[in-house]
Amino acid sequence: MFNKSFGTPFGGSTGGFGTTSTFGQNTGFGTTSGGAFGTSAFGSSNNTGGLFGNSQTKPGGLFGTSSFSQPATSTSTGFGFGTSTGTSNSLFGTASTGTSLFSSQNNAFAQNKPTGFGNFGTSTSSGGLFGTTNTTSNPFGSTSGSLFGPSSFTAAPTGTTIKFNPPTGTDTMVKAGVSTNISTKHQCITAMKEYESKSLEELRLEDYQANRKGPQNQVGGGTTAGLFGSSPATSSATGLFSSSTTNSAFSYGQNKTAFGTSTTGFGTNPGGLFGQQNQQTTSLFSKPFGQATTTPNTGFSFGNTSTLGQPSTNTMGLFGVTQASQPGGLFGTATNTSTGTAFGTGTGLFGQPNTGFGAVGSTLFGNNKLTTFGTSTTSAPSFGTTSGGLFGNKPTLTLGTNTNTSNFGFGTNNSGSSIFGSKPAAGTLGTGLGTGFGTALGAGQASLFGNNQPKIGGPLGTGAFGAPGFNTSTAILGFGAPQAPVALTDPNASAAQQAVLQQHLNSLTYSPFGDSPLFRNPMSDPKKKEERLKPTNPAAQKALTTPTHYKLTPRPATRVRPKALQTTGTAKSHLFDGLDDDEPSLANGAFMPKKSIKKLVLKNLNNSNLFSPVNHDSEDLASPSEYPENGERFSFLSKPVDENNQQDGEDDSLVSRFYTNPIAKPIPQTPESVGNKNNSSSNVEDTIVALNMRAALRNGLEGSSEETSFHDESLQDDREEIENNAYHIHPAGIVLTKVGYYTIPSMDDLAKITNEKGECIVSDFTIGRKGYGSIYFEGDVNLTNLNLDDIVHIRRKEVIVYVDDNQKPPVGEGLNRKAEVTLDGVWPTDKTSRCLIKSPDRLADINYEGRLEAVSRKQGAQFKEYRPETGSWVFKVSHFSKYGLQDSDEEEEEHPPKTTSKKLKTAPLPPAGQATTFQMTLNGKPAPPPQSQSPEVEQLGRVVELDSDMVDITQEPVPDSVLEESVPEDQEPVSASTHIASSLGINPHVLQIMKASLLVDEEDVDAMDQRFGHIPSKGETVQEICSPRLPISASHSSKSRSIVGGLLQSKFASGTFLSPSASVQECRTPRTSSRMNIPSTSPWSVPLPLATVFTVPSPAPEVQLKTVGIRRQPGLVPLEKSITYGKGKLLMDMALFMGRSFRVGWGPNWTLANSGEQLHGSHELENHQVADSMEYGFLPNPVAVKSLSESPFKVHLEKLGLRQRKLDEDLQLYQTPLELKLKHSTVHVDELCPLIVPNPGVSVIHDYADWVKDSPGDFLELPIVKHWSLTWTLCEALWGHLKELDGQLDEPSEYIQTLERRRAFSRWLSHTAAPQIEEEVSLTRRDSPVEAVFSYLTGSRISGACCLAQQSGDHRLALLLSQLVGSQSVRELLTMQLADWHQLQADSFIHDERLRIFALLAGKPVWQLSEQKQINVCSQLDWKRTLAIHLWYLLPPTASISRALSMYEEAFQNTPEGDKYACSPLPSYLEGCGCMVEEEKDSRRPLQDVCFHLLKLYSDRHYELNQLLEPRSITADPLDYRLSWHLWEVLRALNYTHLSEQCEGVLQASYAGQLESEGLWEWAIFVFLHIDNSGMREKAVRELLTRHCQLSETPESWAKEAFLTQKLCVPAEWIHEAKAVRAHMESNKHLEALYLFKAGHWNRCHKLVIRHLASDAIINENYDYLKGFLEDLAPPERSSLIQDWETSGLVYLDYIRVIEMLHRIQQVDCSGYELEHLHTKVTSLCNRIEQIPCYNAKDRLAQSDMAKRVANLLRVVLSLQHAPDATSNSTPDPQRVPLRLLAPHIGRLPMPEDYALEELRGLTQSYLRELTVGSQ
C-alpha cells in the first residue's frame, strides 16, 4: 500500500503513500524537499523525501539516522523500516553510522552510544526500547534500560501476588490529655512498597485481568504465549522488536522479542511480532537491510523475510491473513502491477485489488467483491464472523484478506458474535494479525474486542477494552492468547485461587439466600465474629465509612443511590460478570409498597440510577427522600439558622403537627448542613413510613408532583436565599426578597405610596413569580408589615398562602381574601414519553381544561379559563390556603371522570367477651382502643387521611361527633326524603326530584345514584363524614340521622362508605354511640399502620332504646304555644334564631318561590302558568300542578313583573321601522343563505322622518320617539332632498347647496327649540319681558321678539332687533357702544338681561363688565340652541354648518385661546340634570348626543362611526340598539361604510337579540341576513331557527314561516331541520323523521325510521305508516345517498310490498307470472331478513315476526305454484309443499328457538310424508 501507486489525485502519476507517492517525491505533498521524517528539517538537505522515509542521500534523521533509511537496492516503504543509511546526526546530538529506527545494531533505543533517550545515567551493555539493557540509563529512573522503567516488566508484580504484610509505623495518640506514642499498622495493601505505586482499584483490575478469582496455577515457569499470542521460547537476549528476552514487552514468559527476532536489530530468525516463526534472520519487515527473501509476508510484513516492496511468496494481509504469492508491500500488496489511477483503484489499502473507490463492489480497504457496504450476508453483523466484512457483512471489506478471517483478524471461523459481544461464540474475534490480536478465544459471550464477558465485579481489576487481564484465558486485542494463568512469578497463586474458591463456598454456606436485605445476616460465622468487631478490621472500617443500604431504620431499606460505574447504555460492565457484587439478588423494591396504594407501579430496575446513562449528582449523593434531609423531613419546616441554636426553648408546635412520632421529627440543622440540602432526591416513595408521613402532610392538596416536590423547590430554599442576601428595609415593613418574585405595583412604587403612618394600602395588588404564576387581589389591600417571603409561595402547579394556619388572619384581612390565581406551565405529562403535552389539539382531546375546571370546583375555587399556549390555569378563590393540581388529578388522563366506589374490607368482629387487641402507634406506645367503633368507622377515618384524592381546603379537623348517630333497630329504614316530605306534607317522590335537580352537580350524578340507591338495613349503622368544603357540625341526636346529609358529602365519602358493591353483610354492624377517636395533636396526625386499621374491638353493652314512630303534625303550631316563642334572638342557636323565617328561592324566568304572603298581582302562576314554566324548572317533564293547600307550609310560585307588559303599540315601535327598512332593501339569493342589502339613496330617510312626524300624539309623547324624531329630521335636513332645489333642471352650485343646507339646518334648530322657547316665554312674558325676548332670539324668532318688545314699551330694543339680520356694521356699532359703557362704567347701571341681548346683537358670546363680571350669552342654554346662536348671530350669514360646529366645539372645550363658555352636547336624557362632561373622565371618550355626532359626520366624512352608533348617545338603555341599527343601515345607503367589522357584528347581534327577547325572532333573522360573511350569516340564522321553531302548527307560526320563506327567502329546509331538532329534544321520533325528510336529510331520516319506528310498525302491522316513509326514500336519487339502504330500509319495503301483493292475489285470481314474481320476492326476503340490524329486544321481535311470516308466505306461494289439478276439488295445502323447495329458504330465516322448533316439526312431518309416499 505504501510502496505502490494509490491513485493520482494527490501526486500526479505517483502512488498514494509509496514510492514517489503523496508523501514522497514529486507529489503534491513532497516535491524536491524532504518528507516529514526524513527531510532537512533535521539537519541535512536531500533530494527527495517521503513522509516515512524514501530514498535519501545524506539526511540527518530524527533519532540519529538518515531519515530512517539509506540508499539501498531495496525500495523503502513507510516508516523506513529496514533500510540502511549513511552517517547522520540524531536529534539529541549523537552520531550513528547507518542506522534505522528498528534495524540497526545501534538503533535509537538500543545503541551502545549515548542517545537521546539513554544518556541520563548509568550505562550497561546493550539496550532496547522495551527492556533491553543498554548503555544509557532509563529516563524514568530504573536501572534497566526499558523506556518504561523495569526491565522486561519483570520487576513490577501484576496484581496482588505478594501476600499482604501490613507495614508498621509509629504515631501519636492523645488520650486523657496525654500524648502517647503507639505502633501502627497500615491495613491497606497499597501501603506495601510492592504496591505503593498502584491504587486499590488498579490492583483489583490486575487481579481480575489475571483471572485471579479462584484457584490459581503456579505461575512463572509455565508455558505462556507471546505478546500477541505467539508460542513461547527461551532466549536471554533483549531487544526492541527483534531481540530475544525471557519476559519481553507484553509476552511474559516467552523467548521471543516484541516483534519476532532474537538478535539485536532486525535481522535474526526467531519468532515475529505476533508469534510467527520466521524462516531466517530477518529485519523488522523480514528483510535483512536490502536483501531479498522469499518468506511468508504478513500484513505489516512483521516476521517475514521479504524486503519492503520486494516480491515475496505467500504474503499475508494486515492481520495475518495468508494471501497468494505476489509482490508484497508494507501490508502485503503487490508492487509490480499498480498504476497511478483513481483513488482506490488498483490494489486496495490492505492488499486487495480494487476496481475503484466507490465503484460497485469495491471498498476502501481493498475489497474486490461485487457487493456494497452493508449488504446482507450469511453471517451475523459482528466482529468474528466467518467472513471479512467490517461489521460482519460477508463479501465486503475484507481488509486485505481473501480468506475466511474477520475484519481485523478477529475470530476466524466463528459462528459470529456481535460487535459488542451479545452472542456467545466459539473463537470470538479469532486469530488474525499474525495469529495474534485475539487468537483462539474460548467459547462464551464476547465483548467488543473478543474477551469473554465476566460478570460485573468491583470497580477495579479489569483490563483495557473489557478484558479480564493479561495472560488469561481470553484475549484483548490479541494480548494474551490462550495461556496458562500467569501471576508474574508468584508461586502462591494457586493457593490464593484455592482461598478465593473457599471464600465463595463459605459465602454460599453462610448466605444461602444471597445478599438480599431481607435475609441479610441470618447466620453468622462464629469464627469470624470476633474478628469483625475489631476496629482494625477492613470490613469494619468499610462499614464505618461507606454509606450502605442496610441502615437500622423503620423502613425496609433506604434508597441511597450508588454512583453509576459507567455511563454507557449497557446494563453492566462485562468484566465483573460472575463476581459477588453489592447489588442484591433480590431487588430493593421487591418487598416495598408501591408509590400509592391505589396504583400499580412497575419499577424498571434496568433504568435505575445505577445504570442510567446520565448520572445526577443530586441522586448519587442524596440521602433518602423520605427521611429528613440532614435530619429534616420537609425543608420548609426548619427554622432559620440563627434560631436553630435555641434548641432548648424551641417551639415544636409546627413540627408536631406533622410528626407525632418523635423519631421522625426534624433534627435542628447546623449551619453547615443548611447549604448542602438543596440537591435532594426525588425518588419514588415506596416505604410504609414514607407513605404514612406523606399522607399525614395532606392539608387539602398533597405535594403536586414529583417534579414540584418539597425537595426541589422547597420553601426553606427561598428562606436561605433571603438570609444570604442583605436587603433594605421597606418603609411599610413589606418583605419580599425571594428570587423571581415580583409585585405590581413594584416594591419601589409601594414605598412611594406609603403614608406618614407607615401604612401601605394599594388597590388591585398583584404578586407573582416569573415562570410560575401570579395572584391578583382585587380592591384595596393593606400590605403593611407583611412578610411576603413567608406568606406567599408560588410553585409549579400550586400556590400556598399562609402555610401556617395559626398565623392566618380572618377571611378578608391581609392576603386571606378573594383573589384571582394564575398558575403558568400547567400541562399534563404523557405517560409514555414522560414529556409535557403542550399541543392545544391534544389538550382538547383529553379534555384537560374540563379536568382543571373539575379540580377547581373540587377545591372550592371558581374556574375562569385555561390558556394552552402558556399552560396558564386561571381560577378565583374566596380565601386562601393551598390550591393546585395534585398527582391523582394528573393520573386521570386515560380514564373517564366517573366516580368509582371503593369497597371496604373489614375484619370480622371478634366474639363477645374477647379481649380487645391494643393497637400500637408508630412510636411504640400502646394506643387506647376506640370505644365500640364499627369497622366502617375505623376504616373510613383512616382512609380519609391516607387517600390522595381527599381535598381539604379549609384544613379543619373532622368533628368528633360526626359519625355517631344510629338508626333504631325496630324502625323500618326510611329515606331522608320520606322524613322531610312527611313533615311537610309533600309527595316524597316530587321532593326527591326537586332535591336532585337543585343540589347535584353533573359529575356527582353517579355518586348520588350510589348514595341514594343504598337504603340502610335494619340495625345497620349510617355514618357520614363532613365534606372538607362544607364543614358541618354534627351533633348528638336520638333520632335517626337522615341520609339527606349525603347531598353535602364529598364524593369520597359517598363513594367509599355507601358503596353499592359492598354487601349488606359487610356493612351491617352493631349500633354505636361512641365518637371517633381523633388524635388531638392536629388534623394531620399520623394514622395507624395499615395492619392495625382493621382490628375491630368488641362491642360495648348497649341499652335497649324505645322505638317511637313518626307523628305527623296536622298544622303549624301557633307561635304563642311554640317552644321557640320568645327565643328568636338567641344568636348562638341557629334553630331558634329567626326560627319562623323562611328563605326566598329564585327560579328561572324571574320566578319567586316563597312560603309567605303572596305578592300583589301574581296569582296567575298558582294556576296554569306553573305548568308552562316547568320546562325551566325542577321537573324533567311538565306535570299537572298539585295544590299544596293541605299543608300549612304553602309554597307560592310567583313571577315578578320587572316592567309593564308590552302592549301592541310597543311592538309597533319595533315592527314599523323594520317594515320600512325591508321596503327599501334588496334580497340577494345568489348563495344558499340570502343576503339583504339596503337600497342606495335617501328615500328611506324621508320615510323614517315621515313616520315619526305622522305618529299619533301619544306616541310622540314617548321620550324615545321624541329623540328618534329629532334624529331622523336632522338626517333629512343634512342629507335629504331639498324642496327648494327639486324644481331646478341644472345641478345647483356648491355655494347654493351649502346655503340651502344651512337654511334646512336652521329650520331644524328652530323646530327643536320651539317647545322649550314657548315654555320659557310663557313663564317670563309678564314679569321679565327682556328674558322672553332673549328666548325668542335663541329660536331665531326675531319677529316675535320685536312684537314682544313693542308690547312691553321697549321700542328702541325693538328697533335694534329689527336690524339684527342686517349688515356687519350694526354689530360693530353695538360693540363700540358696549365698549363705551365699559369705559364709563355705565354698564353697572344696566340690567344683565339687557346687556346679554346687546352682547348677542354685537356678536360677542362673552362680554367683560366693568365690575369684574362677565356676561355669557350661552349660559343656561342647551347645546342645540347654543349652536344656533353661533350659527345665526356670532358668524356671518354665509357661514357654513361646519364652521358653526367648529366654533361651537371651541366653546365647550378648554382651548389655549380661551375658556369654555358653552355646555357640552350631552344626550337628551342627560340634558337638564346637571351632568357635565368632567364626570365622564373614566371613559375613553366623552358621552355626546347622536345629533352632534351626525353633524360631525356631515362636516367630516371620515368621522368615527362607532361613537355615533353607541346606544348611550341616544337613550339611557345601553342595550337599546333600535335607532343605532337603523342609522347604520341609512348611513350604508349613503355610502358611509367605514365601520369596523367587529363593531358591525356587535351591532347586528345586539339588535337581533333585542328583537328575539321581544318575541320578534323572525325579524331578528331579517337583521342577521344583513351580515356580509356568508358563513356567519348562515350559522346565526340556523341557530335562531333552532331556538324558536315550534312543532305546533298555529296560524301565527304559519304566518311567520311564510314571512321567512317568501319575503326573506330563507330556505324551507332550514325551518324543517330546526323542527327536527325540536322534535328530537322532545323525543318525538315521528315528527323528527318527518321533518328530517322534509329537510332533505335522507340518511338521517332512514336511520331514525329503522332504529325507532320500523319495529313498532311491523309489530303493530301498521304497514301503511312505514311504507309512507320508505317509499319516499326509495327513489334512486335519494336511496343512493342512504347508508345501508339495501340491508335495512329496502328489506322492510320489500316485505310490505310482498304482503300487499299476497293480499291482492288472494282477492283476485292471479297468473303464473305473478306467482313466479312473488316467489322470487319471498325467497329474496329469506336471505335478507337476517341482515336487518337489531338494536334492542323490540327489533329482534320484529325481525322474528317478519321471519315467521315470510316462512308462511313461502309455504303459501309454493302451495299455489304446486296446486292440485283443476279437475280435483281439493284446495292447496301449505303443509304439503315439497321439502326440497321449502327447507333451503326456511333455514336462512333468523327465528327464535320456539319458532325454529315449530318449523322443524313441520319440515320433519313433510319429510316423513315424502318418505312414506316414496315407499308406496
From Swiss-Prot:
> Coiled coil: which residue ranges?
none
Point out the cross-link Glycyl lysine isopeptide (Lys-Gly) (interchain with G-Cter in SUMO2) in this chain: K563, K603, K665
What name goes with this protein? Nuclear pore complex protein Nup98-Nup96
Q: Please explain the role this protein plays, according to its UniProt record.
A: Plays a role in the nuclear pore complex (NPC) assembly and/or maintenance. NUP98 and NUP96 are involved in the bidirectional transport across the NPC. May anchor NUP153 and TPR to the NPC. In cooperation with DHX9, plays a role in transcription and alternative splicing activation of a subset of genes. Involved in the localization of DHX9 in discrete intranuclear foci (GLFG-body).
Instruction: Name positions with the PTM Phosphothreonine.
Output: T670, T1069, T1771
- Location of the Peptidase S59 domain: 738-880
Q: Which organism is it from?
A: Mus musculus (Mouse)
Which top EC class is named for this enzyme in its record? hydrolase
Name the residue ranges with Basic and acidic residues bias.
Answer: 525-534
- Residues of the region (GLEBS) are 157-213
Q: Where is the composition biased (Low complexity)?
A: 673-682
Where are the stretches annotated FG repeats 2? 214-480
Q: What is its EC number?
A: 3.4.21.-
Active-site residues annotated for this sequence: S881 (nucleophile)
Site, as annotated: Cleavage: F880, S881
What is the protein's membrane topology class? Peripheral membrane protein
Q: Name one Pfam family in it.
A: Nup96
User: Keyword Ubl conjugation, does the record have it?
Assistant: yes
Q: Where in the cell is it found?
A: Nucleus membrane; Nucleus, Nuclear pore complex; Nucleus, Nucleoplasm
Q: Which residue ranges are recorded for the region named Disordered?
A: 512-535, 663-682, 886-937
Protein family per UniProt: Belongs to the nucleoporin GLFG family.
Q: Where does the record place the region FG repeats 1?
A: 1-156
Cite the domain annotation text.
Contains G-L-F-G repeats. The FG repeat domains have a direct role in the transport.
